[in-house]
Curated annotation (Swiss-Prot):
The keyword Lipoprotein does not apply. This is Large ribosomal subunit protein uL13. Belongs to the universal ribosomal protein uL13 family. This protein is one of the early assembly proteins of the 50S ribosomal subunit, although it is not seen to bind rRNA by itself. It is important during the early stages of 50S assembly. GO terms for molecular function: mRNA binding; structural constituent of ribosome. It comes from Citrifermentans bemidjiense (strain ATCC BAA-1014 / DSM 16622 / JCM 12645 / Bem) (Geobacter bemidjiensis). Pfam families: Ribosomal_L13. GO terms for cellular component: cytosolic large ribosomal subunit. The gene is rplM. Keywords: Ribonucleoprotein, Ribosomal protein. Part of the 50S ribosomal subunit.
Amino acid sequence: MKTQVAKKEEVTRDWYLVDVDNKVLGRVATEIANVLRGKNKPTFTPSVDTGDFVIVVNAEKIALTGRKLADKTYYSHSSYPGGLKEITAGKLLDKKPEELLKKAVKGMLPKNKLARHMLKKLKIYSGGAHPHAAQNPKNLNI
C-alpha cells in the first residue's frame, strides 16, 4: 500500500462555524488550530495546506481560567528605543477580543510560511453575526 500525499490542487476545503461563548481559550484554540492545519482529515500532509476555513463568533465572551485576565501579559515592540508595549489579557479582551483568540491560535500553528496561509483561513467576529452565510458553514462542536 502506498502512502497518500495530498496535492495543493486536490484539496477540498469546508467551512466550520465555532461559537466560543463561555468556552476556555486554550481548549478552543487547539481544536481550531487542528482544523486549520487539516489534522482532522485522512489526507493530512505536513507540507501541504490541507486545512479548512473556520468562522468564530462571540469572541468577546471567551473564558480564561484562573487569574489570567489580570496576570497574562502580551508584549510588542515598535523597534524604537523604549518602544516595549505590554497589555494584559483582560485589557486585550476588552479592546480587541478577536486579537486574543488569534494570538492563541497562531501560537499553536507551525512556525513557517504555511502557517500564514493557515491563519488567513481563520475568520473571527465579536458578535454572533458573520457575513459568511453563503458558504453554508457546518457547526464544529468543541
